[in-house]
């Protein structure tokens, strides 16, 4: 895994790359990109995996002008130009799925196939009720029960983290609040743009996801012209982390089905 810092539009963007072959742009969720996670190896075995840390996450800088998820999509589009790619497959997890849909509405021809894993980004329910539980108001123990199929196995022990890792965790959470607090976890304009997405799209959800419900996912998928949904068993909001083998198999099968 290669790590670099790339300067784009005033952002010092942390960038991870691995493998060779058809390119995949991987857009991480609120926890950031962790190159040691087991799903990374199968994705990069036959593909070129390009995984930036969003501005304000990991070790990427966050200039003052970036104050919305929509802004991040433009940064990643410029990244694709910088690395010389006209078209990529895109995988987006949670808020990374939101970034991915924003990106796909702005440059439909740049996205060959799209995978959205427990994505947020749209409002599908009544205006007076949250579609996604308020993660900023929940105690950590309650949040972990919503995030994971098996919280006891997946919960991080903070005493085993380095000071740098703890600082990144705190920074990731602060950036998430800045970008997704108001309006909460959605862009009111995005549903009116999703008809522009031309890529075949796979919506993935862990069966025990307590943040993104099956109803929300289905309603989200109906907003795109060519989308379908699948469920990964024994997984919560991050199936790529809880069930990396099943996740990689499902995603690669979908991507390979469209290979020329």
Language model: regions and residue ranges:
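Acidic catalytic loop of the alpha/beta-hydrolase fold
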Residues: 208-212
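Conserved alpha/beta-hydrolase catalytic His-Asp/Glu region
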Residues: 125-130, 140-198
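Short alpha-helix in the alpha/beta-hydrolase fold that links the catalytic acid
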Residues: 39, 199, 213-222
